[in-house]
Amino acid sequence: MAEIKAADVAKLRNMTGAGMMDCKQALTEANGDFELAVDVLRKKGQKVANKRADRSATEGAVISGTTKDNKNGSLIVLNCETDFVAKNEDFVKFAHSILNIALAKNPANLEELLSLDLNGTKISDEITNQIGVIGEKLDLSYFEKVSAEYVVSYIHPGNKLAAIAGFNQANIAPQVAKDVVMQIAAMNPISIDKGDVPQSVIDKEIEIGKDLAIQEGKAEDMAEKIALGRLNKFYKESTLLNQQFVKDNKLTIGEYLNNSAKGDRKSVV
């Protein structure tokens, strides 16, 4: 059996980020072979992942960014189990490394993002590696992207909230774009305008509105009218262009964009 030196343990720790005792044990099992020791650590990570599969990963980092030309934007959610890990500098750095790959490679979906290379390893495998290092279940649970003439991103302090927005003209004022993306982060609209709301959602809102009106003793025909009135309220609360602007509730976001465009309307895409 090979002698495991402290310098070897430190070297493996620097290579992998794993704990000192984990590295020593891995090198012992691998008889001093660094490549095999890395595999041992990876296998440990896989075991941790399986062991913790029934535990939720509800904390984490929600982050977004854009390419340097502001033509593309991406948003990801990397979950962990505890707030302690979510605030860990290495965890946040790892999340940003995944985001940077998403921006550079522009994958079609989450599955494709997970298959991309990060430091010579597929992102999905690197997540497994990090599970072994960190000791918590990690999950890349969400990925979204936007491509447009001008894309802006926003990350709320603490990495718990983020948003991206695309505009169909490149000459939009940066402050206007920032205001809109912060509106999205704050008010969480389900669509850009009324016409973008799925019919299934509209039908559900009308049905709920009618049921509420009937429970209040309204006749069927009156309940229908009341439901449509409530639907208009739903549009104002849930569609971006019809929401009240959080910085000036006398304006909707649509009106704010029109006023800012000086006759040349800028639309969110």
Regions found by a protein language model. Name each.
Residues 2-269:
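N-terminal assembly/interaction segments in proteins that build large macromolecular machines
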